[in-house]
Amino acid sequence: MITSAHIDDIRTQVRAWRAKGETVAFVPTMGNLHQGHITLVKEAAQKCDHVVVSIFVNPMQFGQNEDLDAYPRTLAADSEALTTAGAELLFTPTPATIYPKGLAQQTFVEVPGISEVLCGASRPGHFRGVATVVCKLFNIVQPDVAFFGNKDYQQLLVIRTMVEDLSLPIEIIGVDTIREASGLAMSSRNGYLTRDEKAAAPALKKALDAMAAGIKQGETFEQVTEQAKASLYAAGFTPDYLEIRHAHTLANAEPEDKALVILAAAYLGKARLIDNLRFDR
């Protein structure tokens, strides 16, 4: 696997592949990789001739008092895992490479509406940072296909909307959430959990499952939401949000809607965990 922090190196290699008529997949990450990331890379390797991965802890998507400085950097272990998974080109830029003028002078991309609810309401500016860096990375790598995890459901819809609105010639593929045996969604932030917190963490997925089951049995959105919140508090969580939305638009779900997604963010100790459950009724 080739590793470079320089934009020109990435473009040169991708151009060489394209000159031979070969396809390029891209998996953007912030590093500290787990099996969920590796699954994205393996899926990408099956879909395209070549796989490019980026590791960049993006300062633009972190708010004040968030965990930018504490976010784990594990490049050596990540590189080894990516090589085994089938990645051929790893882009490891610095903030100065991505934002040479600094954040205050950076042109940004903002996806209105869908970026302003749920995590966007709890973390103002977060999706501006996500959309901006992903757009920049797409312009640098110029992939045919890009892979993202369904665990970050709102992020996936933000990126799909950005690609559609800006007419970017990139196919966006969402990959199912990878979970630990307990049901806990794999996340780089699971490392913040203590042993006792990790034992309690599967209650988040169980709450979503119970909500979906209740809705299918005819319970109201309000009933299942209150029951789920109570179960989360009992397990030691402090919910940030727990909402039922239209699966395609993230608009507030209506009783007649068939395509639904339950989205949750909740604090457990120092960790802010997110999860979702997409279902039809």
From Swiss-Prot:
Enzyme Commission code(s) on record: 6.3.2.1
InterPro entries found in the cross-reference section: Cyt_trans-like, Pantoate_ligase, Pantoate_ligase_C, Rossmann-like_a/b/a_fold
Principal place of residence: cytoplasm
CDD domains: PanC
Active-site residue numbers: H37
Location of this chain's protein in the cell: Cytoplasm
Name this protein carries in UniProt: Pantothenate synthetase
Organism for this UniProt entry: Shewanella sp. (strain W3-18-1)
